[in-house]
């Protein structure tokens, strides 16, 4: 098994529909340690955060975050993590496109050794 630490940055680029912000790769479990959202809009925005379970093809609402204009919020508080299995997704939705930026820090645990690291 290989452990890969990653930072993932993504813009919530659609309004009123779910956007896949991160998907755990094939044969990989992902442990999301931190998620920071920043609102670049002139007004406050609400962001709905969901976890998609690939095994059951079901979205589970995780949190609705209210973010003031030009401010950020941490989605995960002390000792909270999100564990995603292969194919699971972190999804977000906001009424306004291109105003929410996400940075997530995570650990990917591969079930097999990557060929570029052998």
Residue ranges and their predicted role:
Residues 37-42, 95:
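Short solvent-exposed strand-capping/beta-turn motif centered on an Asx-Ser/Thr pair
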Residues 1-30, 34, 93-118:
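C-terminal interaction-tip segments
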Residues 50, 90-91:
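Short conserved beta-strand and strand-loop elements enriched in small hydrophobics
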Residues 54-89:
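Intrinsically disordered, low-complexity Pro/Gly/Ser/Thr-rich segments with frequent PxxP/GP/PP motifs
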Residues 31-33, 43-45, 86-88:
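A generic structural signal for short beta-strands and their flanking turns/coil linkers
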Residues 43, 57, 98:
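Surface-exposed, flexible loop/turn segments at secondary-structure boundaries
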Residues 52-56, 109-111:
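Short edge-strand/loop segments of extracellular domains
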Residues 48-52, 103-105:
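Beta-strand signatures of extracellular beta-sandwich domains
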């Amino acid at each position: 098994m290989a452990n890969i630490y990653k930072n993932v940055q993504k813009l919530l680029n659609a309004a009123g529909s779910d956007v896949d912000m991160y998907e755990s790769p094939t044969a990989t479990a992902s442990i999301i340690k931190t998620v920071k959202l920043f609102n670049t809009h002139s007004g406050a925005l609400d962001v709905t955060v969901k976890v998609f379970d690939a095994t059951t093809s079901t979205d589970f609402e995780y949190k609705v975050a209210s973010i003031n204009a030009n401010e950020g919020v941490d989605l995960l508080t002390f000792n909270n993590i999100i564990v995603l299995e292969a194919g699971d997704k972190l999804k977000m939705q906001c009424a306004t496109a291109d105003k929410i930026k996400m940075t997530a820090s995570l650990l990917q645990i591969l079930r097999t050794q990557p060929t570029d690291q052998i």
